[in-house]
């Protein structure tokens, strides 16, 4: 006989947080949102990869490209580049993010002394960069022989056939810094010598990076930027359970910091095969998340398979219609509460803490805090990020309102046979996502700052200043339908201010 759950499943909107004692320490500026991204032995070692804010962007064509990945990494979060594209194009997106190093920039424009002014101008037109490194082999890490900037030539007075060696600033006239130089030290040198660009060289005088004066303000503006040991932005990449034998090596070679299996339902042998492939070929050096699941059994399965984190949620996304078309899924809040308990149980048994990601169901900013209180270590957001300038879709004017396009990976538009098909066919028999618009909201930086300030303020109301303390000490209450109505404005007539109802 089929098993029937005794209680209905619930969404975030059916819960409220009950305030706790707020001490003098509980102010937003003292709240830390740092949170683990991958599994580790909690209490015995530091987490190998942590997020500075509990936000990752969804593995979607309409959300996560390299532009959004850089913007989110600057704020302390992580993007998973969408996998519903060719292996080559996904790997190239990853490479572009990894080359956008925070402060230390790998030279994208490189020539030899034997090239010409015409080559310099062509590179500037192609890449948009005015600084060209001159190395022995025209490689970004070749022996440094000089640099060319717009100050070194005048197109109106020089022949485009002129050799670079005749107008470049030679090595002996350059001020450089060793590869051990910190970003602060590099900026100090730039300001002391009034430089626009500082080459960073190794012990063999080979170029490693540039540090640019123009980036100084940006460094100060993004203190939580998520970086690796080489000061490059962190980036994730989505994979599927079909072409992973070819896709994973390409993404690892491109520099992806973490992978995530993109599937509407993760409690399957297909996910085990993908994780087994990673462990057999890379051991624990390659990190991989899996999902999605909605109960204890699904979590235990993926944790025991070796997943580095587990995604929770089926059918809760704003463009996902899996529940409607297949009749499978569960209320996001109920799913998260059960999986969080399973995560803690697994930790007590093994000493290994496997972070969980709440994927879907976030409609309002306060839902973020609820999800964290219910046990999520971080949140995967699609619609939220699709609204911003940095998302890859078009901004349109529809009925007098600016919107951005937003479509699900289960829609025909995404052509995502790799997520849903199980029998080898590449057609999509039916859709599990819709094609839609979301209201345009402006820049990622401004909106993320506003949302996270609300999260921090709510945490202070709960008497906590860290996510682990919120998970441990939060008090939540299920509310009735009339309580939900009571929580909004009622029994009044709103005044029209010309600025909306804000």
Q: Which role does the model predict for each range below?
A:
Residues 74-89, 256-268, 308-326, 362-396:
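Glycine-rich phosphate-binding active-site loops on the catalytic face of alpha/beta enzymes
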Residues 80-85, 109-112, 131-135, 176-178, ...:
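Catalytic beta/alpha-barrel core
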């Amino acid at each position: 006989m089929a098993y029937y759950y005794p209680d209905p499943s619930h969404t975030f909107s059916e819960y409220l947080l009950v305030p706790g004692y707020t001490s003098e320490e509980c102010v937003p500026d003292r709240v830390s949102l740092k949170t683990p991204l991958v599994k580790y032995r909690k209490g015995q070692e530091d987490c190998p990869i942590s997020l500075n804010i509990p936000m990752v962007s969804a593995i979607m064509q309409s959300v996560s490209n390299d532009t959004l990945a850089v913007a989110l990494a600057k704020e302390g979060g992580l993007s998973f580049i969408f996998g519903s594209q060719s292996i080559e194009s996904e790997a190239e997106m990853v490479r572009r993010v990894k080359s956008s190093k925070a402060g230390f920039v790998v030279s994208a424009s490189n020539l030899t002394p034997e090239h010409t002014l015409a080559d310099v101008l062509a590179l500037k037109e192609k890449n948009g960069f005015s600084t060209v490194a001159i190395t022995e082999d025209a490689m970004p890490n070749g022996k440094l022989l000089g640099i060319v900037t717009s100050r070194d030539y005048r197109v109106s007075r020089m022949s485009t056939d002129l050799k670079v060696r005749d107008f470049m600033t030679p090595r002996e006239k350059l001020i450089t810094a060793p590869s051990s130089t910190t970003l602060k030290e590099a900026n100090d040198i730039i300001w002391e010598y009034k430089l626009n660009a500082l080459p960073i060289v190794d012990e063999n005088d080979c170029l490693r990076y540039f540090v640019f004066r123009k980036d100084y303000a940006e460094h100060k503006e993004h203190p939580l930027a998520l970086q690796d040991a080489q000061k490059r932005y962190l980036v994730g990449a989505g994979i599927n359970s079909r072409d992973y034998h070819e896709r994973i090596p390409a993404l690892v070679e491109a520099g992806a910091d973490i992978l995530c299996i993109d599937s509407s339902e993760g409690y399957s042998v297909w996910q085990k095969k993908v994780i087994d492939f990673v462990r057999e070929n890379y051991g624990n050096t390659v990190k991989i998340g899996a999902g999605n699941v909605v109960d204890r059994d699904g979590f235990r399965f993926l944790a025991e398979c070796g997943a580095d984190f587990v995604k929770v949620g089926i059918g809760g996304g704003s463009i996902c219609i899996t529940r409607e078309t297949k009749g499978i899924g569960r209320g996001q809040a109920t799913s998260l509460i059960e999986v969080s308990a399973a995560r803690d149980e697994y930790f007590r048994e093994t000493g290994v803490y496997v972070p969980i990601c709440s994927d879907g169901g976030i409609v309002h900013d306060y839902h973020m805090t609820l999800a964290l209180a219910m046990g999520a270590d971080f949140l995967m957001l699609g619609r939220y990020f699709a609204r911003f300038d940095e998302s890859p879709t078009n901004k349109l004017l529809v009925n007098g309102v600016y919107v951005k396009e937003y479509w699900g990976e289960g829609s025909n538009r995404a052509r995502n046979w790799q997520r849903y098909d199980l029998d080898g066919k590449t057609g999509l028999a039916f859709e599990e996502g819709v094609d839609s618009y979301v209201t345009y909201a402006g820049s990622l930086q401004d909106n993320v700052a506003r949302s996270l300030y609300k999260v921090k303020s709510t945490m202070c109301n709960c008497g906590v200043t860290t996510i682990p303390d919120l998970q441990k000490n939060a008090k939540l209450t299920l509310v009735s339908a009339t309580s939900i109505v009571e929580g909004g404005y009622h029994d009044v007539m709103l005044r029209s201010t010309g600025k909306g109802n804000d």
